[in-house]
From Swiss-Prot:
Record gene name: truA
Positions with a binding annotation for substrate: 111
Enzyme Commission code(s) on record: 5.4.99.12
MF terms in GO: RNA binding; tRNA pseudouridine(38-40) synthase activity
Name of protein: tRNA pseudouridine synthase A
Location of the active site: 55 (nucleophile)
Classification via InterPro entries: PsdUridine_synth_cat_dom_sf, PsdUridine_synth_TruA, PsdUridine_synth_TruA_a/b_dom, PsdUridine_synth_TruA_C, TruA/RsuA/RluB/E/F_N
Function: Formation of pseudouridine at positions 38, 39 and 40 in the anticodon stem and loop of transfer RNAs.
Record keywords, A-Z: Isomerase, tRNA processing
Reaction catalysis annotation: uridine(38/39/40) in tRNA = pseudouridine(38/39/40) in tRNA
One Gene Ontology term from the biological process aspect of the record: tRNA pseudouridine synthesis
Species this protein is from: Thermococcus gammatolerans (strain DSM 15229 / JCM 11827 / EJ3)
NCBIfam families per UniProt: hisT_truA (TIGR00071)
């Protein structure tokens, strides 16, 4: 039997997803709890795998890990795990086939970026966004890793205005390092007329002198991963701690925003 966990986390509390010695990461935190509870013996022995290695500061509402449970498989339940986790929540568990791999089985991944309105020209941003849809060489919009194919396909981009900010949603099967954050900054530059759509088209064709820098990571969240025939199960009781923790973060952020908003009004 193999299990998959749907996890969410506050990326600002971790130094990224991937395990690193001596620093707090999402993967490291989760493995520590799973081994402490004897659900797994070690990540190697129990085939621990993750879907997306989010960067430092990037949050997730839907990331996935899988493993073969050991001695205390009965404790691999959201309510038990959430009692032992901090800044990280298990939102569901699923039994999956033995050959399941959370990264390779993913049909698509969706990211959301929350961008404060700086007086953007929305039509220009939308026109620029359409250029990114489809299959392209994203070398100009990524931090390239040696030997990795820079060609990726984006199936959907949307820009939704809300009160004082925009939600940029980007969906594709896989992404390069910093790709989403660099695309967001390109859209931002287009909205401020610092970058023209024609320049974006040229960059996607391989014509560029410098790359677009990445937008800050703190406003990015891995929102959803689509899998074939995988159903994550949970219940209201299991989610109660996550709801409390998220509301606390929301309340704190809202109060700070109000505080600085009043300061701006008085200047």
């Amino acid at each position: 039997m193999k299990l998959a966990l749907r996890i969410a986390y506050d990326g600002t509390a971790f130094y990224g997803f991937q395990r690193q010695p001596g620093i707090r990461t999402v993967e490291g935190e989760l493995i520590n709890v799973l081994t402490k509870l004897k659900i797994i013996e070690s990540p190697e022995k129990n085939d621990f795998k993750g879907a997306s290695r989010t960067d430092r500061g990037v949050s997730a509402f839907f990331n996935v890990v899988s493993f073969v449970p050991g001695e205390r498989a009965d404790l691999a339940r959201p309510e038990v795990l959430n009692h032992n986790l901090h800044d990280l929540w298990v939102l569901g568990v699923a039994e999956v086939p033995d050959d399941f791999h959370p990264r390779f089985w993913a049909i698509s991944k969706t990211y959301r970026y929350y961008l404060i309105d700086e007086g953007f020209e929305l039509e220009k941003m939308v026109g620029c966004a359409k250029l990114f849809e489809g299959r392209h060489d994203f070398s100009a919009f990524a931090r390239l890793e040696p030997g990795r194919d820079p060609v990726r396909e984006i199936t959907h981009i949307s820009i939704t205005p809300r009160h004082g900010y925009y939600v940029i949603e980007i969906t594709g099967k896989s992404f390069l390092w910093e790709m989403v954050r660099r695309i967001v900054n390109a859209l931002r530059f287009c909205g401020l007329s610092l970058l023209e759509p024609e320049e974006v088209g040229a960059m996607l064709s391989g014509v560029y002198e410098k790359k677009v820098p990445p937008a800050p990571p703190e406003n990015l969240i891995l929102w959803h991963i689509e899998y074939p025939n995988v159903e994550f199960k949970t219940d209201g009781k299991s989610l109660s701690k996550a709801r409390r923790d998220l509301f606390e973060r929301y309340s704190r952020a809202l109060a700070r925003a109000a505080l600085f908003g009043d300061c701006l009004v008085e200047l």
